[in-house]
């Protein structure tokens, strides 16, 4: 960048955060009563509350606010996530689907929108991806901790008392029973089928077509466009422009969500939650 601007190595660059840039977007078109909200979803997806990633409770509340805010005429959902919890992704997707019933929802992929990050985009009217975005990864996996060998080497044993065969399917010391493995496998397979089902609905494809490119395969944005997993290759600005077109807006302002909170606000919020 310094070379392009004919600056010396020691010269400082004046920088602006992307959220500030978006907030000042297209000043000539600003109209306070017509707002396009850019909802940022960055990081892994988790259940519960938190501020350093995508937490389902926080995001569900944020989406509901956007749904009920009459000034917000359209939402651009900016996703930059490798995925995470299936349950949390489900909660977010459901709320996005409710939002879409009231106003246009356009998705814009950042550097990556994979697995759950792709899944939560399935409630959108249209998906924009950058050519080099890492996306797809339509798949599900589960992990069960097993310390049986470590326990054996250290002479640790456990003697479970149970009421039926399924009461102790998983033990950190004794491992997983065949029944437990079977149940876990069925759960993962069921979640995968649900994932593919939502993709088939949004992308207007058959189960077989999505399954063929699923199984956890990671794709570039360009490849995803070729096989119909995204609608257009484009930037965040392209998504905003389309959202304005979809909402029939000529004058509007753009606002970034969720609103940033300071470290002190996070601290006091956590204290309130602990009480």
Task: Cite the ranges covered by each PLM segment.
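N-terminal organellar transit peptides
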Residues: 1-130, 134, 141-275
């Amino acid at each position: 960048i310094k070379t392009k601007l004919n600056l010396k190595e020691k010269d400082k660059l004046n920088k602006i955060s992307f959220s500030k840039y978006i907030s000042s977007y297209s000043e000539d078109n600003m109209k306070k009563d017509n707002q396009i909200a850019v909802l940022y979803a960055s990081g892994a997806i988790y259940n519960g509350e938190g501020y350093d990633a995508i937490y389902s409770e926080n995001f569900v509340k944020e989406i509901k606010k956007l749904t009920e805010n009459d000034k917000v005429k359209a939402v651009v959902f900016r996703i930059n996530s490798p995925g995470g919890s299936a349950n949390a992704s489900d909660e977010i997707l459901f709320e996005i689907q409710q939002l879409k019933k009231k106003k246009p929802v356009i998705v814009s992929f950042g550097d990556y929108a994979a697995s759950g990050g792709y899944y939560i985009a399935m409630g959108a009217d249209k998906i924009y991806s950058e050519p080099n975005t890492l996306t797809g990864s339509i798949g599900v996996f589960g992990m069960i901790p097993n310390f049986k060998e470590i326990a054996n080497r250290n002479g640790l044993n456990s003697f479970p008392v149970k009421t039926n065969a399924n009461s102790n399917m998983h033990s950190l010391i004794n491992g997983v029973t065949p029944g437990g493995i079977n149940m876990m496998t069925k759960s993962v397979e069921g979640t995968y089928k649900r994932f593919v089902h939502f993709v088939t609905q949004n992308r207007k494809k058959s189960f077989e077509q999505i399954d063929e490119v699923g199984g956890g395969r990671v794709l570039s944005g360009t490849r995803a466009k070729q096989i119909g997993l995204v609608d257009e290759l484009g930037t965040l600005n392209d998504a905003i422009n389309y959202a304005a077109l979809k909402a029939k807006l000529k004058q509007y302002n753009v606002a970034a969500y969720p609103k940033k909170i300071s470290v002190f606000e996070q601290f006091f919020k956590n204290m309130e939650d602990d009480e």
